[in-house]
Amino acid sequence: MELTWYGHSTWHVTVDDTELLIDPFFDNPHTDTDPEELGPDYVLLTHGHADHIGDVDRYEGCGLVATPEVVEYCKDNFGEFNAVGGMGMNLGGTVEIGDAFVTMHRADHTNGMETSYGASGGMPGGFIISDTKPTQVSDAESTTFYHAGDTGLMTEMRDVIGPFLEPDAAAVPVGDHFTMGPMQAAVAVDWLDVDHAFPMHYDTFPPIEIETQDFVNEVKGTGSDADVHVLDGDETFEL
């Protein structure tokens, strides 16, 4: 599995021959990539705020993985998409898309947007992406990446996502103000019991400017064994 960070919460994930793009927003200071250089098979949207769907219109006709509310908003405003299941998915569900299995879990955040469902974008979420189907009855080897979306610290990270979905790596927001800051994000990494942790959603605009070393130090302070990788924009990590 290859993970490429394009700044903010935008990630490109390659699972065998399937390319996924999460929260496309290339108008951020971390990346020089032209969004039209990418040709994902599926776009995954954690929620409908502008800094997470800002470039989704570049991928009209692409497969779309999001809640029904966000799917309808994208169709109403950006054109036609091939929504997974015809109308999207929802929290707790797992879908098989190409070579990847994607489970959507809730995130503690807001999601205000005007949709045909009303003045709400539904619950925001995060994605657990794996190369094998999640199960409790097999010891098959798997590689699993958790994109937490915009969120605060949740006990579900400790009680559900970590022990049952068993991510090897997690990208967590650390910018504070709108999401977790370095201290809470470090606790999330510890609770998730991952081998690799990546900070995201920081240094995009003034309210979320931080020192990433604070996050590194906080992870160490929890006693976690996770390796923290502060990627440069457009950098790829092989998981």
Curated annotation (Swiss-Prot):
<protein>
    <recommendedName>
        <fullName>UPF0173 metal-dependent hydrolase rrnAC0300</fullName>
    </recommendedName>
</protein>
<keyword id="KW-0378">Hydrolase</keyword>
<dbReference type="GO" id="GO:0016787">
    <property type="term" value="F:hydrolase activity"/>
</dbReference>
<dbReference type="InterPro" id="IPR050114">
    <property type="entry name" value="UPF0173_UPF0282_UlaG_hydrolase"/>
</dbReference>
<dbReference type="Pfam" id="PF13483">
    <property type="entry name" value="Lactamase_B_3"/>
</dbReference>
<dbReference type="InterPro" id="IPR036866">
    <property type="entry name" value="RibonucZ/Hydroxyglut_hydro"/>
</dbReference>
<comment type="similarity">
    <text>Belongs to the UPF0173 family.</text>
</comment>
<dbReference type="InterPro" id="IPR022877">
    <property type="entry name" value="UPF0173"/>
</dbReference>
